[in-house]
């Protein structure tokens, strides 16, 4: 059995239907705001429901400086990259080659429909 190592959550980042960052998301949740509405990201007429919680008006280019990362990134990958960047900033971590083996990411997501 391997020994358990302690970890610390040092930064949080979010891209959600109620906010494009953690503070906005949290404030909107506390205020009881919902991100649900009519689906606009794709034609949902063939589905039994036309209601979803989509991330709207999100532009990863305003957060991610390295355009090469975004060139081939899907929409959901852009969410993850932006949330990761926010988490790093929140933690005050600037990854360098000498420290990259000492930190990691845990990324969670709900359902995202990919478009080709």
Where are these regions (language model features)?
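Conserved "HGTGT" condensation-loop signature of ketosynthase/thiolase-family condensing enzymes
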Residues: 1-113
């Amino acid at each position: 059995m391997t020994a358990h190592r302690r970890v610390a959550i040092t930064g949080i980042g979010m891209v959600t239907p109620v906010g494009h960052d953690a503070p906005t998301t949290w404030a909107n949740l506390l205020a009881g705001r919902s991100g649900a509405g009519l689906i606009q990201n794709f034609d949902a007429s063939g589905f039994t429901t036309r209601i979803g919680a989509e991330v709207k008006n999100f532009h990863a280019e305003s957060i991610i400086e390295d355009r090469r990362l975004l060139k081939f990134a899907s929409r959901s990958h852009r969410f993850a990259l932006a949330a990761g960047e926010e988490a790093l900033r929140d933690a005050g971590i600037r990854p360098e080659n000498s420290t990259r083996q000492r930190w990691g990411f845990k990324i969670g997501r709900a359902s995202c429909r990919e478009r080709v």
